[in-house]
């Protein structure tokens, strides 16, 4: 079989960059170069350098939603499904977590008494829309109508939201839990995350499901259209081809390699 030398990334910029870091020998296409990420855009490599200078010797953990340049300055990269496990395994009693302050606060609570977690002031504009009072009002309103609402939230939400939730997990875990709940007859639920997760749940289950409308659309993730993909595949422009300096790829790959090692 011929080796596939080209990848297309129908997503946000930092995911396309991550694909290039993992497969530097391949041409990676990003059909919508202006499809960024509010969380990734909240931090630059210089911000990480400053944090390291202020906290010498402290390991730096970055969320996957960061640029290649930021990953290159960090010790380990994490996802929403493995960040707790990986941070627990890091040596020492202190760590720096960037850029998501909400996920960082959840990490602080989970590691309380064991590790100090130094945070950065970044956030995802989608998950920042959800607040504790909003969730309480929704639950109260449903309860008045005899509906026992199950709330499933992404860890990028504020700690008040997570406190009001019945389940907290990555997009994949939220989807799996929603499908599991539907299979045992618990059909009334609310997914506190980007709308795409709810769409996937509805597409992948045949059980009766009543998803309350609380999701928020990500304007960046929804930018890419089928026409953009076709155009990029047929005749990509220079800015649609992901280009990262070799040194940045080399340094950023270390943080990803460390993630794979610690996640085992």
Which residues does each PLM region occupy?
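Active-site beta->alpha loop and helix N-cap motifs at the rims of alpha/beta catalytic domains
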Residues: 16-54, 58-78
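Single conserved hydrophobic/aromatic residue that forms the stacking wall/gate
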Residues: 1-8, 12
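C-terminal functional extensions of proteins
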Residues: 155, 173, 193-205, 209-264
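Redox- and metal-dependent alpha/beta enzyme cores, enriched for Fe-S-associated oxidoreductases
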Residues: 105-167, 171-182, 189, 197-211, ...
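Active-site glycine-rich loop that binds ribose-phosphate moieties when present
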Residues: 41-50, 69-90, 97-103, 119, ...
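Short active-site oxyanion
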Residues: 6, 56-59, 92-95, 147-150, ...
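Long, charge-dense
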Residues: 29-55, 119-128, 213-226, 232
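General beta-strand structural signal in soluble alpha/beta enzymes
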Residues: 9, 29-32, 60-64, 69-72, ...
């Amino acid at each position: 079989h011929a080796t596939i030398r080209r990848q297309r990334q129908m997503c946000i910029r930092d995911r396309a960059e991550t694909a290039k870091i993992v497969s530097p020998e391949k041409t990676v296409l990003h059909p919508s170069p202006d499809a960024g990420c509010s969380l990734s855009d909240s931090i630059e490599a210089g911000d990480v350098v400053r944090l390291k200078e202020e906290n010498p010797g402290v390991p730096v953990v970055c969320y996957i939603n960061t640029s290649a340049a930021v990953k290159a300055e960090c010790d380990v990269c994490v996802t929403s499904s493995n960040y707790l496990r990986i941070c627990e395994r890091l040596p020492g009693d202190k760590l720096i977590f960037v850029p998501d302050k909400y996920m960082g606060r959840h990490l602080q609570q989970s590691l309380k008494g064991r590790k100090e977690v130094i945070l950065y002031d970044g956030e995802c504009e989608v998950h920042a829309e959800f607040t504790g009072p909003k969730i309480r009002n929704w639950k109260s309103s449903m309860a008045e109508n005899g509906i026992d609402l199950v709330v499933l939230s992404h860890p990028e939400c504020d700690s008040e939201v997570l406190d009001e939730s019945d389940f907290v997990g990555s997009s994949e875990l939220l989807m799996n839990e929603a499908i599991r709940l539907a299979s045992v007859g618990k059909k009334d639920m609310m997914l506190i995350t980007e709308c795409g997760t709810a769409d996937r749940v509805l597409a992948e289950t045949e059980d009766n499901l009543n998803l309350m409308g609380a999701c928020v659309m990500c304007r960046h993730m929804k930018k890419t259209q089928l026409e953009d993909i076709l155009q990029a595949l047929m005749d990509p422009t220079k800015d649609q081809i992901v280009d990262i300096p070799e040194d940045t790829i080399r340094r950023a790959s270390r943080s990803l390699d460390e993630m794979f090692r610690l996640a085992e």
